[in-house]
């Protein structure tokens, strides 16, 4: 299941918990599933955030190298 599918299911769970008259057992099961999905989504987002940080560091390094090359040519 990918991130978007998990988010969609999580939204559906929230909507059901907010709008339906559920038994305590059903509510707890849905809540537990929601927490599970939340943790997986958070993990994915944290991994993607690290990738973005790495890309930005590479970009900064490229800009620093380009600046040094221009200084060397002067």
Curated annotation (Swiss-Prot):
Name of the top EC class for this enzyme: hydrolase
Catalytic activity of the protein: Exonucleolytic cleavage in either 5'- to 3'- or 3'- to 5'-direction to yield nucleoside 5'-phosphates
GO MF annotation terms: exodeoxyribonuclease VII activity
GO biological process: DNA catabolic process
Record localization: Cytoplasm
EC number: 3.1.11.6
Pfam short name (any one): Exonuc_VII_S
HAMAP family according to UniProt: Exonuc_7_S
Job description of the protein: Bidirectionally degrades single-stranded DNA into large acid-insoluble oligonucleotides, which are then degraded further into small acid-soluble oligonucleotides.
Family indicated by similarity: Belongs to the XseB family.
Protein name: Exodeoxyribonuclease 7 small subunit
Originating organism: Thermotoga neapolitana (strain ATCC 49049 / DSM 4359 / NBRC 107923 / NS-E)
Designated gene of the protein: xseB
């Amino acid at each position: 299941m990918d991130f978007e599918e998990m988010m969609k299911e999580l939204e559906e769970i929230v909507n059901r918990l907010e709008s339906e008259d559920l038994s305590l057992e059903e509510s707890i099961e849905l809540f537990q599933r929601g927490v599970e999905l939340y943790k997986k989504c958070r993990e994915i987002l944290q991994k993607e955030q690290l990738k973005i940080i790495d890309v930005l560091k590479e970009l900064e390094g490229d800009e620093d190298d380009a600046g040094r090359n221009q200084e060397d040519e002067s």
